[in-house]
């Protein structure tokens, strides 16, 4: 039974101005445009300026939301920022965004579930609002992955970019957005995708490339193309829905080949899939809100559409949900 009382009422996004194309990368590492497109589907990614950080781009995504939907955020009572690249270890990026927005009397927390972060953030927002503890929550997926990317490592630097997306979630028991969720984590595989912190070992393995993102691409690929279809099946069962009732599938935009394999295994046509990787690369927790906003701007997402979101990545963690699209037509 659906007990959600939370509705997504607005969306916004922001990407930095600087473009890093495949041709640019060809001058930096042993690669080329054809090789990158064939294996990943990515054509370019955005890169934050030296003085531009996660709180800055997250704030700009909220500003976009406010301008397009004429929303006030003065009475927001919780800010959840989903990121693994905060400006500082402390204070949180959420607190910095709260200050930039000038909101008083609001909670502010960062949530680190890497590429599954945004879907975990929506899960938290739905629970906090449906329980009656909160009425209005900003959920922001924002990353500046370029600042933890080794641009001599072609296995990672071709993939990642920077960007931010934000949604406003409000109390509404008459037209809730959220239908069902499915969450999971396999920490025993944590050393397949990591960015080092204080510890120098994980699962008995010496960690490498201190301070930068490290990925065992083939291992993560094999895990994702099996785990995500199973998770999609579970979230459909919890909603008592069939896959042909889904209008749009929005997976984490890690790699187009991976998305194609997930679609093939789950029986969802690629034509019903929204992704943001072609123009923005893998932006971790920002890929799903960026893809949703692309769907809005291109007129694909319609009121009442059933949308299946699935985030997956570092942890290795995953989180999926089904929502009914309830965002009204933007005012501007």
From Swiss-Prot:
Gene3D superfamilies: 3.40.47.10
Entry GO MF terms: 3-oxoacyl-[acyl-carrier-protein] synthase activity; beta-ketoacyl-acyl-carrier-protein synthase III activity
Reaction equations catalysed: malonyl-[ACP] + acetyl-CoA + H(+) = 3-oxobutanoyl-[ACP] + CO2 + CoA
Keywords: Acyltransferase, Cytoplasm, Fatty acid biosynthesis, Fatty acid metabolism, Lipid biosynthesis, Lipid metabolism, Multifunctional enzyme, Transferase
Entry annotation: catalytic residues: 115, 252, 282
Entry text on domains: The last Arg residue of the ACP-binding site is essential for the weak association between ACP/AcpP and FabH.
Function: Catalyzes the condensation reaction of fatty acid synthesis by the addition to an acyl acceptor of two carbons from malonyl-ACP. Catalyzes the first condensation reaction which initiates fatty acid synthesis and may therefore play a role in governing the total rate of fatty acid production. Possesses both acetoacetyl-ACP synthase and acetyl transacylase activities. Its substrate specificity determines the biosynthesis of branched-chain and/or straight-chain of fatty acids.
Similarity section: Belongs to the thiolase-like superfamily. FabH family.
Official protein name in the record: Beta-ketoacyl-[acyl-carrier-protein] synthase III 2
Lineage, top ranks: Bacteria, Bacillati, Bacillota, Bacilli, Bacillales
Gene, per the UniProt record: fabH2
């Amino acid at each position: 039974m659906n007990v959600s009382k939370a509705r997504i009422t607005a969306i916004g996004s922001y990407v930095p101005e600087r473009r890093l194309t495949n041709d640019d990368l060809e001058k930096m590492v042993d690669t080329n445009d054809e090789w990158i497109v064939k294996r990943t589907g990515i054509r370019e990614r955005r890169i934050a300026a030296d003085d531009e950080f996660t709180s800055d781009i997250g704030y700009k995504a909220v500003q976009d939301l406010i301008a397009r939907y004429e929303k006030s955020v003065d009475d927001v009572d919780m800010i959840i920022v989903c990121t693994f690249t905060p400006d500082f270890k402390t204070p949180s990026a959420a607190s910095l965004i709260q200050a930039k927005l000038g909101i008083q009397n609001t909670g502010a927390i960062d949530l680190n579930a890497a590429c599954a972060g945004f879907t975990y953030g929506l899960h938290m927002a739905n629970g906090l609002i449906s329980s009656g503890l909160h009425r209005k929550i900003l959920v922001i997926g924002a990353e500046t992955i370029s600042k933890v990317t080794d641009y001599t490592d072609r296995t990672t630097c071709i993939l990642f970019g920077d960007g931010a997306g934000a949604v406003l979630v409000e109390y509404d028991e008459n037209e809730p957005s959220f239908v069902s969720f499915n969450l999971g984590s396999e920490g025993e595989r944590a050393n397949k995708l990591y960015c080092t912190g204080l510890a120098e070992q994980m699962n008995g393995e010496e960690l490498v490339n201190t301070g930068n993102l490290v990925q065992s691409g083939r291992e993560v690929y094999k895990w994702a193309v099996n785990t995500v279809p199973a998770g999609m099946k579970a979230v459909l069962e919890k909603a008592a829905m069939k896959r042909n009732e889904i209008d749009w599938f929005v997976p984490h935009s890690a790699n187009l080949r991976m998305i194609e394999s997930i679609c093939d295994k789950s029986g969802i046509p690629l034509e019903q899939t929204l992704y943001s990787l072609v123009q923005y690369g893998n932006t971790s927790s920002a890929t799903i809100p960026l893809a949703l906003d692309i769907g809005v701007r291109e007129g694909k997402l319609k009121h009442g559409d059933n949308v299946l979101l699935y985030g997956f990545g570092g942890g290795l963690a995953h989180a999926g949900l089904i929502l009914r699209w309830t965002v009204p037509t933007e005012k501007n």
